[in-house]
Amino acid sequence: MAETEERSLDNFFAKRDKKKKKERSNRAASAAGAAGSAGGSSGAAGAAGGGAGAGTRPGDGGTASAGAAGPGAATKAVTKDEDEWKELEQKEVDYSGLRVQAMQISSEKEEDDNEKRQDPGDNWEEGGGGGGGMEKSSGPWNKTAPVQAPPAPVIVTETPEPAMTSGVYRPPGARLTTTRKTPQGPPEIYSDTQFPSLQSTAKHVESRKDKEMEKSFEVVRHKNRGRDEVSKNQALKLQLDNQYAVLENQKSSHSQYN
């Protein structure tokens, strides 16, 4: 496989080289023809200035130069034709038997109309100064709407909205009661209720409630009085009997059986 690929590549490059050689030879031949035509034209000018004495020879030289100049001029014309760019012309296809022709013509007309609308300067020149402008103004997009008179202002009477009740259930007795709002003034700095302090509690005056509370509770005035009462109660509950007397009785019974 590798050998066949190499052979095909060699053949391809060999053909390419041959084409290049042919092009070079054609160029050399055209250059030689151009040089020959230039020499023939100079020889013809010299024969015309020589006189009538050399009759046949200048004529022969002239014909030879003309013959040499012929192929050179032809090669020049061929090279000029090759150098010039050829514009491709689209061939018009006959759509007479089909419906496609009508569609194509309509699309071409639409394109022309769009171009005219986009280029107002060209239409102005073609229409004699005012044709395109009239066409644009006559379009449906340039129709001016009639000016409408402003409507009379409508007077709206605001109806009082009913008071919105909250969703909280209230008994009928509580519904009629109205909360009295106390006037909120500046805070009293020197009042003990709003700004209590330790000094105000030290100067506390005894009231009737305090006296009643003192009657229900026992006020302790001595530190060791409570402890003495507890120690006396514990001393009364002491058991002075011998707890091991039962064991002595058991020992005596065992000794009797022995």
UniProtKB/Swiss-Prot annotation:
Cell location: Cytoplasm
Feature: compositional bias, Polar residues: 191-202
Domain of life: Eukaryota
Expressed in which tissues: Expression levels correlate with those of HER-2/neu in breast cancer cells.
InterPro entries: CDV3
Residues found modified as Phosphothreonine: T4, T182
Gene Ontology CC annotations of this record: cytoplasm; cytosol; plasma membrane
Ranges of compositional bias, category Low complexity: 65-74
Regions of compositional bias (Basic and acidic residues) in chain numbering: 1-15, 203-231
Entry-annotated residues carrying N-acetylalanine: A2
Membrane-spanning segments: none
Keywords (A to Z) from UniProt: Acetylation, Cytoplasm, Phosphoprotein
Disordered: annotated span: 1-234
Database matches in Pfam families: CDV3 (PF15359)
Record PTM Phosphotyrosine, positions in chain: Y95, Y190, Y244
Comp. bias (Gly residues): 36-64
Residue numbers of Phosphoserine PTMs: S8, S106, S107
Acetylation keyword on record: yes
Family (UniProt): Belongs to the CDV3 family.
This protein's name: Protein CDV3 homolog
Name of the encoding gene: CDV3
